Amino acid sequence: VSAWVGLAELALSGCTTSTDHLYLHPRGGGDLLSAEIAAAVYLGMRFHPTRGSMSLSEKDGGLPPDDVVQDDDTILAESEVAVARHHDRSHGAMVRVALAPCSPFSVTRDLMVRSAELAEKLDVRLHTHFAENAEDDDFSLAMFGCRPFEYLRDVGWLSDRTWVAHCVMPNDTEIAELGRAGIGAAHCPSSNLILASGIAPVTALRRAGVHVGLGVDGSSSADSASLWLEARQAMLLAKLRDGAAAADARMALEMATIGGAGCLGRVGEIGSIQVGAVGDVAVWSLEGPRFAGAIADPREAWLRCGPVGARDTIVHGRFVVRDGRLTSPRVAEMLTTHRRLAARMQNPG
């Protein structure tokens, strides 16, 4: 239900393809990856979930409690099963799976190395948190004796099958190396603002050849699953960091479309309207008082005059949102169920 609600909110914002970094697998929690894939299939969203993992608990010097971590062998075995069960390699696939240790600080070095090897063997993508804030730099230097970028390189992750979350703190040399490696970065502007993590150097990353897409992050650090909002925040933060002329709506739109496709290794297949691409389209109405007079540049009007939801969101030729409403027949039922479960979790007494 939670996955359905999050994906539904994304669809209403014009998102056609999403991923999820599912790295908590509580004991007795069931097959959560299959459950969220089922939610995406039911809604009609294109989905790239990751089989995430955490292997260092509190007793090992990590952050999570013991009951949500797994040992390396179990993680890798279940990752291979998930890929075999769900990963569709065909053109226009609606479901693909990536491997995603949570972060270099919540898994063993061996798991990072073996995950990269398994991704190579299975020909799937890799994802992890990277250089999110200054604390990450400090922790990496103290724990590994090197910066996060150097650690990523040392464990075999500096490849064009990798995309990372955040990428707030790389220096100029590292940005150039990330670009040469063909790495992707999911820029999460709202989350970075809420947590005061900093502003990712997206202009420099894009200039270096890094595929920069957008992430809405999760409910623990961002409260709106809106791709449109993240595009607007990305544009404004790039202006704040690098000057008013550093970003515009076209740049933000590219991050929300082609940049995301690059992160997922699907340039020319999704994220663009061209011969050979799938039928994914978001349609926006530029009518009404908020757009009055906004005629000269529809792209700037789209991003500056909102906030607005998509009029239509079409995935693989099928309407997921039509006339601003979800086409799913069970919207009210799903929201009622979600509200009941959320209330029970937040008020267990």
How would you label these PLM feature ranges?
Residues K59-D60, A134-C146, D172-G179, A196-L205, ...:
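Histidine/acidic-residue-rich catalytic or RNA/ligand-binding cores of hydrolases
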Residues P26-V168:
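Metal-coordinating catalytic core of metallo-dependent amide/deamination hydrolases
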Residues G44-R46, A116-R125, W157-D160, E177-A186, ...:
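Glycine-enriched alpha-helix->loop->beta-strand junction motifs that scaffold or abut catalytic
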Residues T162-P170, H187-N192:
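Catalytic beta/alpha-barrel core
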Residues G14, A40, L99, H129, ...:
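Divalent metal-coordination and catalytic microenvironments
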Residues D154-R161, T203-G288, R304-C305:
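His/Asp/Glu-enriched, well-ordered alpha-helical/loop segment
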Residues V278-L335:
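C-terminal cap of metal-dependent C-N hydrolases
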Residues V1-S34:
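Metal-associated gating/positioning segment near the N- to mid-region
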